Amino acid sequence: MRPRSGGRPGATGRRRRRLRRRPRGLRCSRLPPPPPLPLLLGLLLAAAGPGAARAKETAFVEVVLFESSPSGDYTTYTTGLTGRFSRAGATLSAEGEIVQMHPLGLCNNNDEEDLYEYGWVGVVKLEQPELDPKPCLTVLGKAKRAVQRGATAVIFDVSENPEAIDQLNQGSEDPLKRPVVYVKGADAIKLMNIVNKQKVARARIQHRPPRQPTEYFDMGIFLAFFVVVSLVCLILLVKIKLKQRRSQNSMNRLAVQALEKMETRKFNSKSKGRREGSCGALDTLSSSSTSDCAICLEKYIDGEELRVIPCTHRFHRKCVDPWLLQHHTCPHCRHNIIEQKGNPSAVCVETSNLSRGRQQRVTLPVHYPGRVHRTNAIPAYPTRTSMDSHGNPVTLLTMDRHGEQSLYSPQTPAYIRSYPPLHLDHSLAAHRCGLEHRAYSPAHPFRRPKLSGRSFSKAACFSQYETMYQHYYFQGLSYPEQEGQSPPSLAPRGPARAFPPSGSGSLLFPTVVHVAPPSHLESGSTSSFSCYHGHRSVCSGYLADCPGSDSSSSSSSGQCHCSSSDSVVDCTEVSNQGVYGSCSTFRSSLSSDYDPFIYRSRSPCRASEAGGSGSSGRGPALCFEGSPPPEELPAVHSHGAGRGEPWPGPASPSGDQVSTCSLEMNYSSNSSLEHRGPNSSTSEVGLEASPGAAPDLRRTWKGGHELPSCACCCEPQPSPAGPSAGAAGSSTLFLGPHLYEGSGPAGGEPQSGSSQGLYGLHPDHLPRTDGVKYEGLPCCFYEEKQVARGGGGGSGCYTEDYSVSVQYTLTEEPPPGCYPGARDLSQRIPIIPEDVDCDLGLPSDCQGTHSLGSWGGTRGPDTPRPHRGLGATREEERALCCQARALLRPGCPPEEAGAVRANFPSALQDTQESSTTATEAAGPRSHSADSSSPGA
């Protein structure tokens, strides 16, 4: 037997072999010399570059375990792991069955080994490098070998060999098309436990970008902002809705209260004497023109309960109450029942004032065509609408201004004193006139014209007593005043005293004046200016270029001018072209040099005394009509003359006053420019008459613009000779002073004073050189000076543009030349030649003191006119007045009128040649009068 020691030498031999292997292994595992420092820095930078960021991308590995049960069912368990994508492979998702591979198994290059089917995920656990000092393949080579065998992805456990990460990253230049993932730490332990214990497991690799910490921050801010804004809007809407509901409830309560305060009446068609809205109405309403309900369009039945709104409109109570509760306004006029201010008795007071105001009527003087230049501002006053006793709407003014109280008496109403007066020019002197005129008979049936016209869509009617001042203020005229009793020396001589003079300098005004829309020029249309008065209740728009713009209820008709041409057409008596105070400003004919006549209808001018009164020639008319309430025609001192005589008071029983208007238009259709001074109103007016009633009288007066003339006998005053004014032309239209008729004797003692003509024209514009046509004896003289159009006047204006200023005559003392009973304001001076329904008469004595010469001679165009004495002039003018009286008297026999007409043309021819001498005589006197006048 061998001893045991014999075995020990063998054990010693094995140790020796191990020792020998270690040095050999150590010799094989010697590392190459370390690379230089710049190379290491480059590698670090490369690792810190995009590759490092790419290597940090996370790979989510989801391992699904399948456990089979005895019944054949499978139970799945999912385990989530986290790894990193290596730069050696692609960064994408992959899925497949897990197959564990040994590192040495990947080194086998035997082609006989079975290849796995495509779609598996290989899991390789790397060992320590010391255990494999001489590996057959690198880690990257092993990954390539696995992909070649059909692996969709390769997962390396680098927990024991961290250097493998760097080896994998070295293959970034030629990466694989399949993902290469490495895991370590706890995730690697979980993965290896699953691989070692489970036979069937499936891995799903997903690539997810790293979540940003502010990924949903913007969305959160937006949602928060949206929620806040929504809440704010919701709160505001709720508040607004609640406020509207409270306001609606309040308005409904106010409407109910207003409805409770409104009166209800029972309709009674049998009661004819009681009017709607009258103060005496108790519990019934009378029938009127509106006997049907405007809502249901059914007629009122006796005993039906009607609701009367504060605007005096009435409806069925059952029809209007729901509307009023919902809309709070009148269905007819939109009157707000909640905002109604004032007491219920205001309508009654207004109705009573209106009924009293209707008793006083006035016809405005003639308006001459031209362009108006207003010298003061025109503010607008608020108005409100009410109803008169006839059911017609009237507009009332609301005045808050306070004018110069010193100009009005204590008895003057407050609404009159609230208007500032307009200071007028006192530039015209007076003259003597001994003519007597007849009083005007108040008996005249007024008719209401139908509304017609295309100049304005809705008539602006003002028929209340107070509304006349809007007309005056809009036109820039003076304002009225009511005075006390007149002096006893001016007692009325006629049936009644219409204008008792006053010595306190009061102002003139009409009682009722309507205001129409402002004038404007349109092609083929007319101006819609109309001065309408109390005896009418509807404003009229009219066409001045047609044979009658509206239909009328009147059966009588006459002839009137409806165009600027010489044609004469039939017009009804109450045509809108001839309403009292209406005026036409339309320039229809392009060929005619002058505008048409002012359209005025007939008005009765009946004499109250058979033989002692007369009517003046044709010209501007002052027509007064009305009823007994007396008013005063005050007088204002004029600086144009140094002496005066008492004026007689008119014998008309009317309580009307004189008024004037200013209107605005283009004199010619082709005018476009105009030069005006700051405070001047200039005009040139051509009057054109129809040749149907009298011979075509043509007379051109030459002279200074301050030469006055008589409104009755149509004679200008004499003027001293003087040099001509040169190229600066002046033209003046004169109307005599206001006329009175009193009870004093015909030869009463004169009083100092002077008067101013009613119309004054300023010489700022170049006048026209055409003559002025007159029909009969005009009451207004138109004086013009023929000058060169390119003269040195310096006005720089166009000759087609003219202006006119229609003003009041304000005098403090009666003018000279008119004895008591000499004139009558109620006399109407016809403008239209065919409107001769007045009993015209001329005085037996005409005491004009003029130096324009006789009317009876003829002279050549170059024959000088001698200056005649005062006595000879008076005799010739007296004869001239008698001839004119015979010519204009409607009842004149044909043979007598023919005899007069036979002698009359010679006088007219004579007067046409009398321009130069009168102009030279009026020059110095005009300048002296201007220097002595203090101005307006």
Swiss-Prot record:
Zinc finger (RING-type): 293-334
Bias (Polar residues): 654-684
Membrane topology reported for the UniProt record: Single-pass type I membrane protein
Keyword Transmembrane helix (UniProt): yes
EC id: 2.3.2.27
Regulation affecting activity: Negatively regulated by R-spondin proteins such as RSPO1: interaction with RSPO1 induces the indirect association between ZNRF3 and LGR4, promoting membrane clearance of ZNRF3.
Domain of life: Eukaryota
GO BP annotations listed: limb development; negative regulation of canonical Wnt signaling pathway; negative regulation of non-canonical Wnt signaling pathway; protein ubiquitination; regulation of Wnt signaling pathway, planar cell polarity pathway; stem cell proliferation; ubiquitin-dependent protein catabolic process; Wnt receptor catabolic process
GO function term, MF aspect, one: frizzled binding
Residue ranges crossing the lipid bilayer per the database entry: 220-240
Catalytic activity: S-ubiquitinyl-[E2 ubiquitin-conjugating enzyme]-L-cysteine + [acceptor protein]-L-lysine = [E2 ubiquitin-conjugating enzyme]-L-cysteine + N(6)-ubiquitinyl-[acceptor protein]-L-lysine
Similarity annotation: Belongs to the ZNRF3 family.
Record's function text: E3 ubiquitin-protein ligase that acts as a negative regulator of the Wnt signaling pathway by mediating the ubiquitination and subsequent degradation of Wnt receptor complex components Frizzled and LRP6. Acts on both canonical and non-canonical Wnt signaling pathway. Acts as a tumor suppressor in the intestinal stem cell zone by inhibiting the Wnt signaling pathway, thereby restricting the size of the intestinal stem cell zone. Along with RSPO2 and RNF43, constitutes a master switch that governs limb specification.
Record-given protein name: E3 ubiquitin-protein ligase ZNRF3
Organism taxonomic ancestry: Eukaryota, Metazoa, Chordata, Craniata, Vertebrata
